């Protein structure tokens, strides 16, 4: 089960990515008992934000979707890294909660729809039973590196 995520991502056509490195003094993932806390993930590919700017002013709907999906993939890459390094066999992975921060203007109102791209991908990866989660979508005035989105998550695992 420790390589479950890697196999699952491959089976649904998602190319495995190397886990992101922290851009400041924090860890990308922390395991505490049976909870894994994944730090906010940006839509970074090859060291760059794929589409910088505000969701509603600078990006098309397709670019927003790609950004959210890439941030979600980056979250799973970090989650996978901490899971494969465990000595014990993992029998269950469940997404408990996600938070999505959207770089947008005061007039933006599509927070729920935008974060659905992340939620849909999580359910696709983990299945409805283990992928369904609570969530919060938050509009903000800016994000690190002028990213359009940042996503963090809390997952539970059973040994």
Tell where the protein language model's regions lie, with residue ranges.
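Short, polar/acidic, helix-capping and beta-turn segments at strand->helix junctions
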Residues: 1-159
């Amino acid at each position: 089960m420790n390589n479950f995520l890697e196999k699952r991502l491959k089976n649904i056509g998602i190319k495995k990515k190397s886990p992101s490195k922290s851009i400041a003094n924090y860890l990308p993932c922390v395991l505490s008992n049976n909870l894994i806390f994944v730090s906010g993930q940006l839509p970074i590919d090859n060291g760059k934000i794929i589409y910088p700017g505000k969701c509603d002013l600078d990006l098309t709907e397709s670019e927003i979707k790609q950004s959210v999906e890439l941030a979600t993939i980056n979250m799973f890459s970090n989650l996978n890294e901490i899971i494969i390094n465990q000595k014990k066999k993992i029998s269950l992975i469940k997404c408990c909660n996600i938070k999505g921060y959207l770089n947008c203007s005061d007039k933006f109102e599509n927070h729920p729809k935008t974060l659905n791209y992340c939620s849909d991908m999580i359910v696709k990866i983990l299945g409805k039973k283990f992928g369904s989660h609570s969530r919060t979508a938050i509009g903000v005035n800016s994000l690190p590196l002028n990213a359009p989105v940042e996503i963090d998550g809390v997952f539970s695992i059973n040994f």
